[in-house]
Regions:
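Alpha-helical recognition/docking segments in bacterial nutrient-uptake
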Residues: 53-168, 172, 231-233, 247
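Flexible loop/turn connectors
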Residues: 225-334
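Short beta-strand segments enriched in small/hydrophobic residues
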Residues: 14-16, 50-68, 177-184
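N-terminal helix-turn-helix DNA-binding module of bacterial transcription factors
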Residues: 1-52, 333
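Short acidic/polar active-site loop segments enriched in Thr and Asp
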Residues: 11, 43, 115, 176-178, ...
Length: 334
């Protein structure tokens, strides 16, 4: 109903919300839409029959899909999708495969089907690609990613604080021999978590040696298991480990038990994400809770305001989390 949107001087998505009697539109805007429908000679039933839900694109790298569906990003997506449906949008999920698709083809596809785009996570979706998406002049919001030096609206978990908090927790328990199972550097969220860990260690005068920070094995689905095995095979064994994500921690815990060691008596372990499985590991995993569903909801709300033509100052929004202490780090050293 582009003609109604033009007469009412609103977005097509606003017309859709009004006709479908959805929330998210101011009373004054709602009245303008109905006035335009009347002026153009449409009946209510005509308008409801003709209007189609506006589309929003959700873009994520294909490599993230197993983790997205099983652990972390499933909740981000569910939050985004439920809020999109509440606001009257149809979600077009697009998984970018860098081996099978060019960034040019991606831009063409998204421009044809979406009134706005949310990019969830980064990784293979590089800063250069995001800047190219900006050139489409379509509302764009980032979730759990950002581009340094670009004032793009984004919604993030408080990843630096998460890293700082889990490391500080181990330091407060008396640990000084602490390893970090880091993640791939192409993810800004994981980089911020690592920076937080190192900042907390530096504040305590602790330097993490390189051999206590094994590199991730990007192509191996059991990254945490492989990294922990590498640590356990070294001459010196840490008394505690920070895993950069719960998925990494699950693999690390398996390797520790396989080596005949006890958690936390021989090695304490903490992590970041606090997915539902974390409370049911043996022992239950200490983890910093990232409000994943809320990130998706807030990203969609921000995108809706942009699509609706509202003035939106581009800000980097951080969603607060909290440390959930469980038995995996319970032992104190004296």
């Amino acid at each position: 109903m582009r003609d109604v949107a033009d007469v009412a001087n609103v977005s097509v998505s606003a017309v859709s919300l009004v006709v479908r009697n959805k929330a998210g539109v101011a009373d004054e805007t709602r009245q303008r839409v109905w006035d335009a429908i009347s002026k153009l000679g449409y009946s209510v039933s005509d308008a409801q029959e003709e209007v189609r839900s506006p589309g929003v694109g959700l873009l994520i790298e294909r490599g993230s899909m197993p983790a997205m569906l099983d652990i972390f990003y499933g909740e981000v997506v569910r939050g985004f999708q439920s809020e999109a449906q509440r606001l009257g949008y149809q979600v077009h999920l697009h998984m970018f495969d860098r081996h099978a698709e060019t960034s040019s083809a991606l831009r063409t596809k998204l421009a044809s089907e979406a009134n706005g785009i949310v990019v969830a996570n980064d990784g293979d979706i590089t800063p250069e690609m995001i800047m190219q998406l900006e050139e489409l002049n379509v509302p764009l919001v980032l979730a759990e990613s950002y581009v340094a030096g670009r004032r793009l609206p984004c919604v993030l978990g408080d990843n630096f604080t998460a890293g700082y908090s889990v490391m500080e927790h181990l330091l407060a328990a008396g640990h000084r021999s602490i390893a970090i199972l880091q993640g791939p550097r192409k993810y800004s969220s994981l980089n911020d978590r690592l920076k937080g860990c190192l900042a907390a260690a530096a504040s305590a005068g602790l330097l993490i040696p390189p051999h206590f920070m094994p590199s991730p094995h990007s192509e191996n689905p059991r990254k945490g298991y492989v990294q922990m095995k590498e640590l356990l095979e070294a001459d010196q064994r840490p008394t505690a480990v920070v895993a950069i994500s719960d998925k990494t921690a699950f693999g690390a815990m398996e390797a520790i038990k396989e080596a005949g060691l006890r958690i936390p008596d021989d090695i304490a372990i903490v992590s970041i994400d606090d997915v539902s499985e974390s409370a049911y590991t043996n022992p239950p995993l200490t983890s910093f809770h990232i409000p994943r569903s809320e990130i998706g909801v807030l990203a969609m709300q921000k995108l809706h305001r942009l699509i609706s033509g509202e003035t939106e100052v581009p800000v980097k929004s951080l969603v607060y989390g909290e440390l959930i202490v469980r038995e995996s780090s319970a032992q104190k050293l004296y």
